[in-house]
Amino acid sequence: STLFPYTTLFRSVIPRARGPVRSRDEASILAELRQLAASGYREVVLSAISLPSYGLDTGTNLVELVEHCAQVEGIQRIRLGSLDPDMLTPEFITRLAAVEKLCPQFHLSLQSGCTATLRRMRRVYTAEQYAQVVDQLRAAYGERPVSFTTDCICGFPGETQADFEESCEFLKKIGFLKVHVFPYSRRSGTPAYDFPEQVHEREKQERSRVMNGIAEEVRREVLAAYVGTEDDVLLET
Protein backbone atom coordinates (compact mmCIF):
# COMPACT_ATOMS: atom_id res chain seq x y z
CA SER A 1 0.00 0.00 0.00
CA THR A 2 1.06 3.62 -0.43
CA LEU A 3 1.07 5.45 2.88
CA PHE A 4 2.38 8.95 3.49
CA PRO A 5 1.83 9.87 7.17
CA TYR A 6 3.73 13.14 6.83
CA THR A 7 1.74 16.27 7.51
CA THR A 8 4.25 19.01 8.23
CA LEU A 9 6.00 21.44 5.93
CA PHE A 10 9.50 20.01 6.25
CA ARG A 11 8.48 16.39 6.61
CA SER A 12 6.44 16.59 3.42
CA VAL A 13 9.83 16.37 1.68
CA ILE A 14 10.51 12.91 3.14
CA PRO A 15 8.07 10.83 1.04
CA ARG A 16 9.29 12.57 -2.10
CA ALA A 17 12.86 11.61 -1.24
CA ARG A 18 12.34 8.20 0.36
CA GLY A 19 8.97 6.97 -0.88
CA PRO A 20 6.07 5.56 1.16
CA VAL A 21 6.23 3.75 4.50
CA ARG A 22 8.20 0.51 4.35
CA SER A 23 8.19 -1.47 7.60
CA ARG A 24 10.99 -3.90 8.30
CA ASP A 25 9.81 -7.48 8.77
CA GLU A 26 9.26 -8.19 12.46
CA ALA A 27 10.89 -11.62 12.26
CA SER A 28 14.15 -10.09 11.03
CA ILE A 29 14.07 -7.52 13.84
CA LEU A 30 13.59 -10.18 16.49
CA ALA A 31 16.32 -12.33 14.93
CA GLU A 32 18.74 -9.41 15.12
CA LEU A 33 17.79 -8.76 18.74
CA ARG A 34 18.53 -12.37 19.63
CA GLN A 35 21.93 -12.07 17.95
CA LEU A 36 22.66 -8.85 19.83
CA ALA A 37 21.62 -10.40 23.13
CA ALA A 38 23.89 -13.39 22.48
CA SER A 39 26.76 -10.95 21.89
CA GLY A 40 26.19 -9.29 25.25
CA TYR A 41 24.06 -6.30 24.30
CA ARG A 42 21.44 -5.44 26.90
CA GLU A 43 19.78 -2.34 25.44
CA VAL A 44 18.25 -1.72 22.03
CA VAL A 45 16.76 1.40 20.47
CA LEU A 46 13.93 1.13 17.96
CA SER A 47 14.23 3.99 15.50
CA ALA A 48 12.69 5.08 12.20
CA ILE A 49 11.78 8.15 10.16
CA SER A 50 8.20 7.87 11.45
CA LEU A 51 8.35 5.28 14.22
CA PRO A 52 4.63 5.26 15.19
CA SER A 53 3.83 4.45 11.53
CA TYR A 54 5.50 1.06 11.87
CA GLY A 55 3.24 -1.68 10.57
CA LEU A 56 0.77 0.54 8.71
CA ASP A 57 1.82 -1.23 5.51
CA THR A 58 1.91 -4.74 6.99
CA GLY A 59 -1.11 -4.92 9.27
CA THR A 60 0.80 -4.78 12.54
CA ASN A 61 1.81 -1.88 14.80
CA LEU A 62 4.61 -0.50 16.94
CA VAL A 63 3.12 -1.60 20.27
CA GLU A 64 3.02 -5.23 19.17
CA LEU A 65 6.64 -4.99 18.03
CA VAL A 66 7.71 -3.56 21.40
CA GLU A 67 5.82 -6.29 23.24
CA HIS A 68 7.51 -8.99 21.16
CA CYS A 69 10.95 -7.40 21.51
CA ALA A 70 10.51 -7.45 25.29
CA GLN A 71 10.17 -11.23 25.13
CA VAL A 72 13.70 -11.66 23.76
CA GLU A 73 15.81 -13.22 26.51
CA GLY A 74 18.85 -11.15 27.44
CA ILE A 75 17.47 -7.79 26.31
CA GLN A 76 16.93 -5.79 29.49
CA ARG A 77 15.99 -2.35 28.21
CA ILE A 78 14.18 -1.05 25.13
CA ARG A 79 14.15 2.57 24.07
CA LEU A 80 12.10 4.26 21.39
CA GLY A 81 13.24 6.87 18.91
CA SER A 82 11.32 10.05 18.14
CA LEU A 83 7.53 9.82 18.50
CA ASP A 84 4.81 12.06 17.08
CA PRO A 85 2.39 13.10 19.86
CA ASP A 86 -0.62 13.08 17.56
CA MET A 87 -0.15 9.36 16.93
CA LEU A 88 -0.07 8.34 20.60
CA THR A 89 -3.58 7.17 21.45
CA PRO A 90 -4.70 6.31 25.01
CA GLU A 91 -4.63 2.58 24.14
CA PHE A 92 -1.14 2.95 22.64
CA ILE A 93 0.08 4.66 25.81
CA THR A 94 -1.53 2.12 28.16
CA ARG A 95 0.02 -0.82 26.35
CA LEU A 96 3.46 0.79 26.19
CA ALA A 97 3.41 1.49 29.92
CA ALA A 98 2.67 -2.19 30.56
CA VAL A 99 5.98 -3.27 28.96
CA GLU A 100 8.37 -3.48 31.91
CA LYS A 101 11.50 -3.47 29.75
CA LEU A 102 10.53 -0.25 27.98
CA CYS A 103 12.53 2.67 29.33
CA PRO A 104 10.07 5.39 30.44
CA GLN A 105 11.93 8.08 28.54
CA PHE A 106 10.20 9.49 25.49
CA HIS A 107 11.40 11.81 22.76
CA LEU A 108 8.20 13.58 21.71
CA SER A 109 8.50 15.81 18.67
CA LEU A 110 7.47 19.37 19.61
CA GLN A 111 9.16 21.99 17.37
CA SER A 112 7.34 24.85 19.12
CA GLY A 113 5.41 25.35 22.34
CA CYS A 114 3.23 27.98 20.65
CA THR A 115 0.09 26.75 18.90
CA ALA A 116 0.10 29.64 16.42
CA THR A 117 3.60 28.65 15.29
CA LEU A 118 2.63 24.97 15.15
CA ARG A 119 -0.23 25.89 12.82
CA ARG A 120 2.15 27.75 10.52
CA MET A 121 4.31 24.62 10.50
CA ARG A 122 1.17 22.65 9.62
CA ARG A 123 1.61 20.44 12.64
CA VAL A 124 -1.59 18.53 13.35
CA TYR A 125 -1.47 19.01 17.12
CA THR A 126 -1.66 22.02 19.41
CA ALA A 127 0.51 22.79 22.41
CA GLU A 128 -2.44 21.88 24.62
CA GLN A 129 -2.85 18.49 22.94
CA TYR A 130 0.87 17.85 23.33
CA ALA A 131 0.62 18.57 27.05
CA GLN A 132 -2.33 16.18 27.30
CA VAL A 133 -0.23 13.36 25.82
CA VAL A 134 2.51 14.08 28.36
CA ASP A 135 -0.06 13.98 31.16
CA GLN A 136 -1.45 10.69 29.85
CA LEU A 137 2.00 9.11 29.76
CA ARG A 138 2.78 10.24 33.29
CA ALA A 139 -0.57 8.96 34.52
CA ALA A 140 -0.03 5.60 32.81
CA TYR A 141 3.23 5.09 34.69
CA GLY A 142 1.78 6.11 38.04
CA GLU A 143 4.53 6.64 40.61
CA ARG A 144 7.29 5.63 38.19
CA PRO A 145 9.15 8.72 36.95
CA VAL A 146 8.85 9.48 33.25
CA SER A 147 11.25 11.79 31.42
CA PHE A 148 10.79 13.65 28.16
CA THR A 149 13.17 15.04 25.56
CA THR A 150 12.31 17.00 22.43
CA ASP A 151 13.40 19.34 19.64
CA CYS A 152 12.43 22.99 19.37
CA ILE A 153 12.90 25.45 16.51
CA CYS A 154 13.53 29.15 17.09
CA GLY A 155 12.69 31.77 14.49
CA PHE A 156 10.27 29.90 12.24
CA PRO A 157 8.81 32.38 9.70
CA GLY A 158 6.18 34.54 11.38
CA GLU A 159 7.27 33.74 14.94
CA THR A 160 6.82 36.91 17.00
CA GLN A 161 8.56 37.72 20.26
CA ALA A 162 5.33 36.82 22.08
CA ASP A 163 5.19 33.48 20.25
CA PHE A 164 8.77 32.77 21.25
CA GLU A 165 8.13 33.61 24.89
CA GLU A 166 5.06 31.36 24.88
CA SER A 167 7.22 28.53 23.56
CA CYS A 168 9.77 29.11 26.32
CA GLU A 169 7.07 28.98 28.98
CA PHE A 170 5.83 25.72 27.53
CA LEU A 171 9.26 24.14 28.02
CA LYS A 172 9.04 25.04 31.70
CA LYS A 173 5.49 23.69 31.94
CA ILE A 174 6.42 20.25 30.56
CA GLY A 175 9.72 19.95 32.40
CA PHE A 176 11.89 18.41 29.69
CA LEU A 177 15.00 16.46 30.62
CA LYS A 178 16.67 17.73 27.45
CA VAL A 179 15.71 20.01 24.59
CA HIS A 180 17.58 20.12 21.30
CA VAL A 181 17.25 23.79 20.39
CA PHE A 182 18.15 25.02 16.93
CA PRO A 183 17.40 28.05 14.74
CA TYR A 184 15.09 27.68 11.77
CA SER A 185 17.05 26.85 8.64
CA ARG A 186 15.54 28.04 5.39
CA ARG A 187 15.40 25.02 3.06
CA SER A 188 14.60 25.38 -0.63
CA GLY A 189 11.92 22.98 -1.79
CA THR A 190 9.80 23.45 1.34
CA PRO A 191 6.72 25.72 1.43
CA ALA A 192 8.16 27.64 4.39
CA TYR A 193 11.04 28.81 2.19
CA ASP A 194 8.69 31.30 0.52
CA PHE A 195 6.84 32.33 3.67
CA PRO A 196 6.75 36.07 4.41
CA GLU A 197 7.98 37.44 7.74
CA GLN A 198 11.27 35.56 7.72
CA VAL A 199 13.03 36.12 11.04
CA HIS A 200 16.45 37.78 10.84
CA GLU A 201 19.36 35.39 11.30
CA ARG A 202 20.75 37.36 14.23
CA GLU A 203 17.38 37.21 16.01
CA LYS A 204 17.11 33.46 15.41
CA GLN A 205 20.52 32.93 16.99
CA GLU A 206 19.62 35.12 19.98
CA ARG A 207 16.36 33.28 20.57
CA SER A 208 18.21 29.98 20.37
CA ARG A 209 20.69 31.20 22.97
CA VAL A 210 17.92 32.27 25.34
CA MET A 211 15.94 29.06 24.90
CA ASN A 212 19.04 26.92 25.44
CA GLY A 213 19.57 28.69 28.75
CA ILE A 214 15.99 28.04 29.82
CA ALA A 215 16.21 24.40 28.72
CA GLU A 216 19.34 23.93 30.83
CA GLU A 217 17.63 25.42 33.89
CA VAL A 218 14.69 23.06 33.42
CA ARG A 219 17.06 20.12 32.98
CA ARG A 220 18.76 20.87 36.30
CA GLU A 221 15.39 21.02 38.04
CA VAL A 222 14.35 17.66 36.57
CA LEU A 223 17.62 16.01 37.61
CA ALA A 224 17.42 17.51 41.11
CA ALA A 225 14.16 15.63 41.67
CA TYR A 226 16.09 12.34 41.43
CA VAL A 227 18.50 13.20 44.25
CA GLY A 228 17.98 10.82 47.16
CA THR A 229 15.93 8.29 45.18
CA GLU A 230 16.77 4.65 44.51
CA ASP A 231 16.27 2.76 41.26
CA ASP A 232 17.68 -0.08 39.18
CA VAL A 233 20.25 1.05 36.63
CA LEU A 234 21.82 -0.48 33.55
CA LEU A 235 25.51 0.42 33.44
CA GLU A 236 26.75 1.63 30.06
CA THR A 237 30.31 1.25 28.81
Positions of PLM-derived features:
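Conserved alpha-helical substructure of the radical SAM core
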Residues: 16-45, 64
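Aromatic/hydrophobic pocket-lining residues that form the small-molecule binding cavity
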Residues: 29, 62, 130, 164-167, ...
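N-terminal intrinsically disordered, low-complexity, charge/repeat-rich segments that act as generic
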Residues: 130-140, 144-198
